[in-house]
Amino acid sequence: MRAARFYGAKKPLVVEEVERPKPKQGEVLVRIFACGICGTDVHIAIEGLFPTLFTPITLGHEGAGVIEELGEGVSDLKVGDRVGVYPGIPCGECSLCRSGKDYLCPKNMILGIFQDGCFAEYVVVPKENLFFLPDDIPFEAGALLSDAVSTAFHATYKRAEITGGETVSVFGCGGLGYHGVMFAKALGAGKVIAVDVKDELLARAKGVGADFGINPKTEDLNQRISELTDGDGVDVAIEFVGNPEVVLSAMRGLKRGGKLVIVGIGMERVTLPPLRVFVGKELSVLGSMGYAKGEMEKIFALISEGKVDLSNSVTDILSLEDINEGMRKMAEKDGNPIRYVINPQKTT
């Protein structure tokens, strides 16, 4: 089969023939029809921020496709089922796994980092790592559901706990932030304020639910948030950038008792405001990582109710042979992509 192989940081991925994997007991072979190019893939291949367990390795952890073959002992699935692939393989034994937070498992084996991933015609995963994909959801949207979409949902639903009426600011309106705006509105936020340094991304955010857009390069951010909240500040700020300065900007806009949820990942240290301010205002700062498997049904419900529309979430569908160009465009934000999706079954 064909697969896009990673040989080292800052080197192009190599599309080559590799042996098709065989499912072992409890495993499933999935024929991949879509795999999203995630920011993590860019961090690994182009920026060299994260190492993989070994090289060469097949990257890609946002996969969706059709079950091709069942390993021994798999009886609750069948060949031909449409499925999405959960990106992490947890240990299943630790206290976090037993409490339903397996996405935080310290032994989580992420596809494309610890074992071969989904930038290939086929992938093998444990049966527990699959979710059924409804017939009315295309594979490319299913691929995004496995990470990009669900990560944003977890941040808004579980961590920010948006239930209705809140004023929410969303910092960074790229792929994750775009969906963060969408879910904040779908969950009932009374007012959603999008913040980004690109006017085109603010316009796009308004198209999926943002009531206001602020460009800090051309407007006074603090003053504008104060105006939009009658001087109170926002109930919740969600940061999708991973930049210390953006984190602090988001925190400054919180009302007393407000909550900041940080989704963006970066390597730089964040300095808290003076404790007199931080404690005195009873501010909360939370990290948000991944999502729980049980949250997928809530996302499906929002889609079926028409509150969430993923039809514009895919910028383009590329072949494996075009993966390096897709990675470049994601890294350079060329054309402000939401997500490029690779279809390994597609040929140039």
Question: What function would you assign to each model-found segment?
Answer:
Residues 160-163, 203-284, 347-348:
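Glycine-rich cofactor phosphate-binding loops and adjacent beta1-alpha1 units
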Residues 248-252, 293-348:
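C-terminal hydrophobic helical "lid"/dimerization subdomain
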Residues 259-261, 273-313:
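Rossmann-fold dehydrogenase core element
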Residues 91-171:
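NAD(P)H dinucleotide-binding glycine-rich loop of Rossmann-like/cofactor-binding domains
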Residues 137-219, 223:
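Mid-domain Rossmann-like dinucleotide-binding core that forms the NAD(H)/NADP(H) cofactor-binding site
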Residues 19-35, 48-95, 134-137:
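Glycine-rich beta-strand-centered segment in the early N-terminal region that forms part
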